Amino acid sequence: KKGVHNSFESPDSINAIDWRRKAEHADVFAYYKGLIQLRKKHPAFRMGDADLVRKHLEFLPVDGSNVVVYRLKENANGDAWGDIILVLNARKEPAKLTVPEGKYTVVCKDGFINEQGLGTLYGPEVVVPAQSALIMYK
């Protein structure tokens, strides 16, 4: 944006999409594409009704700050995945968390997404790398 912080009324020369950046940051593009596909395929991430959100969304306790952990429970919004745990760790160090006990299939970790799974984690204790997201289900 050439240093323009509020480009709302700026011309196309400021607001045009620089498509070269897509190739330069192919890993980020693939990550966002995977997140979008995950949202499209799983109704738990598309609850459009406040009552559904209240019924299925549960924030899990965390020690300290800069970490958000929530659970989408009971096949939220008709999803095939029974329980989904989503963690956003903004800390500069790994976060050690307590989640409901069980065997989880990891679908998002370390900047990669694979709906078929990137591995397995076992609760109740999990460690999430610094400045990253983790999505897993059981």
Predicted regions and their residues:
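Loop/helix patches that line or flank the sugar-binding groove of alpha-linked glycan CAZymes
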Residues: 1-102
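Pocket-edge structural micro-motifs
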Residues: 21, 71-74, 108, 130, ...
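A short acidic, often aromatic-flanked loop/helix-cap motif at beta-alpha or helix-coil junctions
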Residues: 24, 112-114, 133-134
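A broadly tuned, weak detector of single residues within folded domains
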Residues: 28, 105-107, 124
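Acidic Ser/Thr/Pro-rich low-complexity disordered segments
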Residues: 45-48, 113-117
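Conserved active-site loop/cleft motifs that coordinate metal ions or position small ligands
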Residues: 85-88, 106-107, 135-137
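Solvent-exposed beta-hairpin/edge-strand motifs
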Residues: 100-114
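C-terminal beta-strand-rich structural cap/linker in extracellular carbohydrate-active enzymes
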Residues: 118-138
